[in-house]
């Protein structure tokens, strides 16, 4: 195959997914509104579940929820059958993703939730599936054409599920008037944290600031540098900054330390 065809194939796959993703508008109905309300008014824990690709998507959406102040975590349905079911309690809300809705590994988790009256939001593409039959709120995903040569590999369908999860999160964010200031509280690390950081977040002020009057001597300056542990001292003259002295300056001025030489 000519390498020039690579770009053509990639564009074709991307354009197909873009076309299929427009079907997301079919999901914005009564069930979507019910899901938003259930998430916002949940008095317990918000727990995401899914197996395979759907499980990876559920993990990502759970991470998005937590990063914007909607506490949640992921529970692997397979592990749940081996003891992790104890994480799920009556006031919790389960949000389970499965494209087919008939993944057998979901069976025990669904039975457990139904037995104890735990609310389930099910997300699947088949209305008569195991998942949607067991769910209190049924979000029916539109059928989409996968973008791979076989038409079977989860591509467009996984993108659609991811988009739905992001739409749930952003709708709640808008409703709660989520701001950059709030986001900074939950996402202080990485490039996002750096972008949201303000000078006041790292600024040293008040009693923590190493300052000394210009009439003091080098010995006193050294003492303050050692106490404040910032490697510098700010020299003030009539409450205005006259200069800075670093520990390096003091090392170079060692001959003055034995004297009562004024900093001035």
What is the meaning of each model-derived region?
Residues 1-12, 51-59:
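Short, compositionally biased "basic patch" segments
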Residues 5-41:
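An N-terminal, well-structured beta->alpha segment
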Residues 17, 50, 95, 168, ...:
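Terminal peptide-recognition signature
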Residues 41-163, 167-173:
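Glycine-rich phosphate-binding loops that contact phosphosugars or nucleotide phosphates
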Residues 154-202:
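YjeF_N-associated NAD(P)HX repair module
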Residues 181-207, 242, 246-264:
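Tandem CBS (Bateman) regulatory domains
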Residues 211-229, 254:
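The conserved cystathionine-beta-synthase
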Residues 236, 241-242:
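Short hydrophobic beta-strand segments in globular cytosolic domains
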